[in-house]
Design a protein with these regions (language model features):
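Cleavable N-terminal signal peptides
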Residues: 11-12, 22
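Sec/Tat signal peptide C-region and signal peptidase I cleavage site
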Residues: 18-24
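Bilobed "Venus flytrap"/periplasmic-binding protein-like clamshell domains
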Residues: 27-52, 56-59, 113-179, 273, ...
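Acidic, polar ligand-binding/catalytic clefts
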Residues: 79-111, 190-193
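Pocket-lining segment of extracytoplasmic ligand-binding domains
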Residues: 84-86, 93-95, 123, 159-256
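Ligand-binding clefts/hinges and TM-proximal coupling segments of bilobed small-molecule sensing domains
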Residues: 138-151, 224-294
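An extracytoplasmic/periplasmic, membrane-proximal ligand-sensing/linker region
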Residues: 168, 172, 178-179, 189-207, ...
């Protein structure tokens, strides 16, 4: 199944009067690794929510798709950004989670994420099996991008032990590729990814299409989808690429007050233009896309907002 993801509709007006919170507090929000898109998105959400909920304060921390879900479940954070495939795994306790994570609720989907796997053009890597004995760089262990990179390698019949692997942030991965200490880079992010643009400015790279191993990837995580990375997303990309995809979404502790989460959800819909300054795919986001069923229960506060705009979502 190939799904060509397109953002729906037009942006909501940014200025909307929102109800005051009855429970203003200091909340911890987990975002992404240094050099990625989630940290600036988290900064925008912080500003939006602090204005929408008088007296509130949000602390923004780095994190990752898997770590953020665990952090909320373990009480280390109240809000975070996450990837739909990882959160769906957490709901059932599927690896890398060791038990069902029942205190994590969905607020809103934001935009599609693309798994991108690139190699240095002069590294003579024509198929993934050519990576045996070579160097690969990806995100820290447990990060969603690292998990998908491992699945991608395993779907091709290899293991990390077949190569030298660095588990670092995007910035370090790019530097390793630039200086030749790594010849392959696996990451998931919105597109175009700043890390790949940075790398491409210094080195010629080659993208790997992923249709040939999609069935094998589904065996490792049934939530994976095939989505289209449109031609022209990157310089010298002259054709559409089919890649593994999923959605970035906002999650929160199910224990957060309903009214606060209602306000947070409504303020996302009201400020898509602001969020689009750091995540362009959010520019055309509308409530139906925010409320997409990704296999994760919604917070009652989010459900309250969606009901207000004529959308029914699952809260259990």
């Amino acid at each position: 199944m190939t799904l060509h993801v397109k953002a729906a509709g037009i942006a909501f007006a940014a200025a909307v009067a929102l109800p005051m919170s009855a429970g203003a507090a200091e909340l911890r929000m987990m975002t992404g690794p240094q050099g990625g898109s989630w940290i600036p998105i988290g900064g925008q959400l912080k500003d939006i929510w602090e204005k929408a909920i008088p007296g509130s304060k949000f602390q923004v921390f780095p994190g990752g798709g898997v770590a953020n879900v665990r952090g909320i479940q373990e009480g280390k954070a109240e809000v975070g950004l996450a990837n739909s495939i990882s959160t769906a795994d957490a709901m059932t306790g599927r690896a890398p989670f060791n038990k069902p994570h029942t205190d994590v609720c969905n607020i809103a989907s934001l935009y599609p994420q693309y798994f991108q796997f690139v190699v240095l053009a002069d590294a003579k890597i024509n198929k993934i099996s050519d990576l045996k004995g070579k160097s690969l760089t990806t995100q820290q262990r447990g990060n969603t991008g690292e998990v998908i990179t491992r699945h991608f390698i395993e779907a091709h019949g290899l293991k990390y032990s077949d190569m030298k692997v660095s588990f670092v942030g995007y910035t370090d991965s790019v530097n390793q590729m630039k200086d030749g200490h790594a010849v392959a880079f696996g990451l998931n992010t919105q597109a175009p990814a700043g890390a790949i643009m940075d790398l491409q400015a210094a080195r010629d790279i080659k993208f790997f299409e992923q249709t040939d191993i999609y069935k094998e990837m589904l065996k490792l995580n049934p939530s994976y989808q095939m989505i289209t990375l449109p031609k022209g997303t990157y310089p010298k990309q002259d054709k559409d690429l089919q890649v593994i995809g999923f959605f970035t979404h906002v999650v929160a502790s199910c224990k957060l007050p309903e009214n606060d989460v209602y306000t947070m959800t409504k303020s996302i819909a009201a400020n898509t233009a602001t969020l689009a300054t750091v995540a362009r795919d959010v520019a055309k986001l509308k409530p139906p896309a925010m409320a997409a069923d990704i296999g994760v229960k919604f917070h009652p506060g989010a459900a309250k907002y969606y009901k207000e705009v004529g959308i029914t979502v699952k809260t259990n």
